[in-house]
């Protein structure tokens, strides 16, 4: 219209591209079963100066069929809507929030302190984590007092033993992984990252870790087979101090006192992939995931965006988690069961941690 245009980068199909919850751009294809109908949700960020009729074409393409061009015309009155109509749900303007970058930055929230490191020990507010040679936590401590109202100089152990990532072959033999050099790759006031390559005759395991100022940590364990391997089990074993495992919530267990024994299997009909067990002044939340993770929808919308079974941990329904007492410790054993790995095949055994309590500076 009179030489004016609405640029294509102002037009978004929310189904096919956008910004994810980590602030990263993505694009994806849509799979539609034969005979089914799929609505495409499209938003246009109109310039405030736009008015009149605008004409254009939308091209829709699919595998195996020619692209279809659809003519589109919109008429703009020129009147502006307050806050883009976000205050009224009927306008559906809030769909734009799906691509928001609000709150995505590396700034430290007020009340926390910068992340610091002394050799292999990473310190955050009220907690410390020592990284083992293999890249996994070797020691996690809480310095919060029993009332959780102050921080003491004397810390208490949250875990009794280092995290163990175990690859057991069909014959019962454990794959001996030799850690390479532990490299701290990035450090800022809000986070620290590190990397280790663990090697063996059968496979390599690359460990990437990240710990943030509030106690959130993420771990990526990528296994690459050097030759064909028959596997009995691949598991992550976390040994917690019994005094720091008083309560439990998650994996189909409502919040309350931790049972002496709890067994759980992967089931994507339920939004369950994480466990918290702890006490008032120390604990761990663990979430198991893989490369196909997408944040599920909740409540009545869950069936429209359910949990994806991790190919690694889930292993076609063979995987699960057992929680049980052993002496003065509580064992969290996340197993994945039998499988065959071909030469060159890769598996991603990822998980997240939250070292609790997660709270701001106290007196």
Please tell me what each predicted stretch does.
Residues 6, 67-68, 229-232:
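Short acidic/proline- and small/hydrophobic-mixed sequence motifs that coincide with surface turns
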Residues 17-31, 41-44, 51, 78-345:
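Beta-strand/loop-rich accessory regions of lumenal/periplasmic or secreted enzymes
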Residues 52-63:
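A short beta-strand micro-motif common to beta-rich folds, especially ectodomain repeats
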Residues 3, 64-66, 201-203:
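Residue-level signal for glycine
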Residues 1-23:
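A surface/secretory-pathway sequence property marking extracellular, secreted
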Residues 38-48, 352-354:
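Short, hydrophobic beta-strand segments
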Residues 362:
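Conserved small/polar residues in nucleotide/adenosyl-binding loops
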Residues 68-77:
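C-terminal edge beta-strand
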């Amino acid at each position: 219209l009179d030489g004016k245009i609405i640029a294509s980068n102002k037009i978004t199909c929310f189904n096919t591209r956008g910004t994810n919850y980590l602030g990263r751009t993505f694009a994806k294809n849509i799979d539609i079963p034969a005979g089914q109908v799929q609505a495409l949700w499209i938003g246009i960020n109109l310039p405030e100066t736009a008015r009149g009729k605008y004409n254009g074409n939308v091209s829709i393409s699919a595998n195996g069929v020619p692209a279809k061009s659809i003519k589109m015309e919109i008429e703009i009155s020129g009147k502006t809507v307050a806050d883009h109509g976000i205050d009224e749900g009927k306008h559906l303007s809030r769909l734009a929030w799906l691509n928001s970058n609000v709150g995505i930055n590396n700034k430290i929230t007020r009340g926390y302190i910068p992340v610091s490191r002394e050799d292999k020990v990473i310190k955050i507010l009220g907690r410390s984590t020592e990284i083992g040679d293999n890249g996994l936590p070797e020691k996690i401590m809480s310095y919060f007092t029993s009332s959780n109202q102050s921080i003491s100089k004397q810390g208490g152990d949250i875990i009794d033993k280092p995290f163990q990532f175990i690859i057991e072959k069909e014959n019962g033999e454990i794959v001996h992984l030799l850690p390479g050099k532990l490299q701290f790759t990035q450090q800022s006031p809000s986070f620290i990252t590190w990397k280790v390559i663990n090697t063996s005759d059968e496979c390599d395991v690359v460990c990437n870790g990240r710990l943030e100022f509030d106690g959130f940590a993420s771990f990526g364990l990528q296994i690459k087979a050097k030759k064909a391997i028959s596997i009995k089990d691949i598991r992550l074993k976390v040994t917690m101090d019994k005094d720091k495992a008083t309560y439990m919530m998650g994996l189909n267990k409502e919040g309350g006192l931790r049972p002496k024994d709890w067994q759980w299997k992967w089931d994507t009909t339920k939004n369950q992939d994480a466990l918290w067990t702890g006490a008032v002044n120390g604990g761990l939340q663990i979430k198991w995931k893989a490369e196909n993770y997408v944040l599920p929808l909740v409540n009545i919308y869950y069936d429209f965006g359910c949990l994806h079974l991790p190919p690694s941990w889930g292993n076609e329904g063979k995987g699960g988690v057992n929680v049980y007492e052993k002496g003065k410790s509580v064992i969290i054993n996340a197993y994945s069961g039998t499988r065959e790995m071909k030469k060159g095949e890769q598996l991603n055994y990822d998980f997240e941690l939250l070292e609790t309590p997660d709270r701001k500076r106290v007196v």
